[in-house]
Structure formats: structure tokens, C-alpha cells
Design a protein with these regions (language model features):
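A detector for short, charged/polar N-terminal pre-domain segments
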Residues: 1-3
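DNA major-groove recognition helix of helix-turn-helix/homeodomain DNA-binding modules
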Residues: 25, 44, 48-65
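Short, charged recognition helix plus adjacent turn
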Residues: 57, 67-90
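Recognition helix of helix-turn-helix/homeodomain-like DNA-binding domains
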Residues: 27-46, 68-69
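Helix-turn-helix DNA-binding elements, focusing on the entry/boundary residues of the two helices
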Residues: 8, 19, 34, 49-52
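Short basic helix-loop element that most often maps to the first helix and adjoining turn
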Residues: 6-27, 82
């Protein structure tokens, strides 16, 4: 499964932003902006709801693009399909 940090790094690079630029755009002080974004990209920190909203806005995506799991293995697809089917029967 693709992690939050991997998605964040991909979208940051796609938008041609440095870690410092992204960090400052979401409100981190210039001195620590790059370190904070690096922590999220390496999954050392988990962003709160407000930060997720800001990141999505700056990166030009819906918040769910950052938060919803991305399935990459056949077993993950099978499990997701199973639960979607089970939950739709209720």
C-alpha cells in the first residue's frame, strides 16, 4: 500500500515545490518548514485534519487523495472488494 508520505512527496514534486516551499505554504515557520514536511514524507509524523486540508489545498487535490489508501497488491483489492460487498448488503 502506498503510504501518506509517498503520496505527499509525489504530489509535492509534481507541483515543483521544495519541502521548504510546501511547508511555508501551509504555515510552518521558514526555519523548520523543510524539516516538518520531511517528517510527514517519511511517515515519522501524522498530520492532523487542519494540516491535511491545507496540504490538499496547496497541492490542488481533494483531501481524500492524501488520506484514502491506495491498493497496490491483489490481496488488498480482494479484501477491499469483500468489505465493499459486505457493507453494501446492509
Amino acid at each position: 500500500m502506498i503510504t501518506f508520505g509517498e503520496k505527499l512527496r509525489y504530489l509535492r514534486r509534481k507541483n515543483n515545490l521544495t519541502q521548504k516551499q510546501l511547508g511555508m505554504a501551509v504555515g510552518f515557520p521558514e526555519k523548520t518548514a523543510d524539516v516538518r514536511i520531511a517528517q510527514y514524507e517519511t511517515n515519522a509524523r501524522t498530520p492532523r485534519e487542519e494540516l491535511l486540508r491545507k496540504l490538499a489545498q496547496v497541492l490542488g487535490v481533494q483531501k481524500e487523495i492524501l488520506t484514502v489508501p491506495v491498493l497496490t497488491k491483489p490481496t488488498e483489492f480482494s479484501a477491499a472488494f469483500f468489505w465493499m460487498n459486505e457493507l453494501s448488503l446492509k
